[in-house]
Design a protein with these regions (language model features):
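Structured aminoacyl-transfer and RNA-binding surfaces used for tRNA recognition/handling
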Residues: 1-254
Length: 254
């Protein structure tokens, strides 16, 4: 399957679900002094996520051209590049997690044909000091999606194997399928973690999907992280992030 086919499948998938297809915004952001270049699909959507009405409605989808100069030092591994297109679907006060997560799972497994046995997901652990709760809703929705694959002849695990791991960066995979991380890994804003966000900046927890290249390639064992436990956000390269759902629920106060 080519990149063009994947792009078209994505846009068609969400168009069939009531989304208007948008053209890619400029790589040079308009009315956004926070960055030199458009570095994510989220960036051009910020005004509308803050309440401005979009002329195309409340359900939108696009393939946004992105440039990340900060990733130039990472080019050469199996996960980073400086220029890419980011596929996105946007809900402006319309649907939320209970629609987004099943749709993403359906697109990856049915439209693209990825093996669900190789998919692993992460959710936000929460931060008590900031009053931001653990995203148990996203974790439960993901669990239901994985459970829905049972009985189709392809799923290699049992229901009790859809395990949720609380501290994978400390404890490793632990046979898990769903993993909680803190705001260093599962939070999105243009500025990064909540303590780096300026007043007025929107942000929120996210839920990421990773593809597992498997242990047979020995990517972890032959990396410089071999003496630590592997997990979805390990830098060894065994796991590749292929999707991210951001839930923009917060705005930084003064």
């Amino acid at each position: 399957m080519t990149t063009h086919q994947i792009r078209q499948k994505y846009l068609d998938f969400f168009s069939a679900r009531g989304h208007e297809i948008l053209a890619s915004a400029s790589l040079l952001p308009e009315n956004d002094p926070t960055t030199l270049f458009t570095g994510s699909g989220m960036q051009p959507m910020i005004p509308y996520l803050l309440g401005e009405k979009h002329p195309k409605g409340t359900r939108l989808t696009d393939s946004q051209k992105c440039f990340r100069s900060q990733d130039v030092e990472e080019v050469g591994d199996n996960r980073h590049t400086t220029f890419f297109e980011m596929l996105g679907n946007w809900s402006l006060g319309d649907y939320f997690k209970k629609e987004q997560i099943p749709w993403l799972f359906e697109f990856l497994t049915k439209e693209i044909g990825l093996d669900p046995n190789r998919l692993f997901v992460t959710c936000f652990r929460g931060n008590d000091s900031l009053g931001i709760p653990r995203d148990t809703e996203a974790a439960e929705l993901w669990k239901k999606e994985f459970e829905s694959e049972m009985g189709n002849g392809k799923w290699e695990m049992e229901s009790h194997d859809i395990k949720v791991v609380d501290f994978p960066e400390r404890d490793g995979l632990q046979g898990g399928r769903i993993f909680y991380y803190d705001e260093k890994k599962n939070w999105w804003s243009r500025s990064g973690e909540p303590d780096k966000m300026p007043a007025g900046e929107p942000g929120g927890p996210d839920s990421e999907v990773f593809w597992d290249f498997g242990d047979k390639l020995r990517l972890h064992e032959e990396s410089r992280w071999k003496d630590s436990l592997c997990h979805p956000n390990c830098d060894c390269g065994r796991f590749l992030e292929i999707g991210n759902s951001v839930f923009m629920e917060y705005r930084k106060r003064v």
